[in-house]
């Protein structure tokens, strides 16, 4: 298993329960990365150029660093392109070339075709996957925005059954 890059939607539409689910999944993935001594990058994103990156290298961060990351909430609109480009930058320049990407969002956006094609080219070069976690609040058919670029999509409204186990096991 390689490192993990987690793109977390912190747009205004995720405020409340969806944001709590997103943070819970993110912090669980961080713990899994820590247990197996893998690096973890958290890309907080919202609209426009709003993006913040927290990098957690094994043994190089504190509980305070984790708390600060978990308390961050950007607010605003949603832009999928910015976090995808940031994930690709981390692969190119920060030693995350063997990382898989987890994309957590409520799905209220779409990835432009040019960016999707760039992502597909990078996937062919680096052999990574993108897993989507949809903060769906029980709404039907909200995975349309993740289908074009995510290999597998988990929905928070179904994480109470065995799907949560398969999600966690996929990154152990």
Regions found by a protein language model. Give the residues of each.
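Von Willebrand factor
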Residues: 1-57, 62-104, 108-111, 132-143
């Amino acid at each position: 298993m390689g490192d993990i890059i987690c793109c977390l939607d912190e747009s205004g539409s995720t405020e409340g329960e969806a944001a709590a689910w997103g943070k819970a999944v993110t912090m669980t993935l961080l713990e899994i990365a820590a247990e197996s001594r893998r690096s973890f990058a958290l890309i907080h994103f919202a609209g426009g150029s709003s993006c913040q990156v927290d990098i957690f290298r094994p043994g190089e961060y504190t509980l305070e660093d984790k708390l600060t990351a978990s308390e961050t909430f950007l607010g605003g609109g949603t832009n999928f392109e910015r976090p995808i480009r940031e994930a690709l930058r981390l692969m190119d320049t920060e030693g995350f070339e063997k990382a898989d990407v987890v994309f957590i969002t409520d799905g209220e956006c779409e990835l432009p075709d040019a960016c999707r094609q760039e992502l597909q080219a990078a996937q062919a070069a680096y052999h990574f996957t993108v897993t989507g976690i949809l903060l769906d609040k029980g709404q039907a058919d909200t995975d349309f925005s993740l289908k074009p670029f995510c290999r597998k999509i988990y929905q928070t409204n179904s994480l109470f059954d065995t799907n949560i186990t398969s999600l966690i096991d996929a990154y152990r």
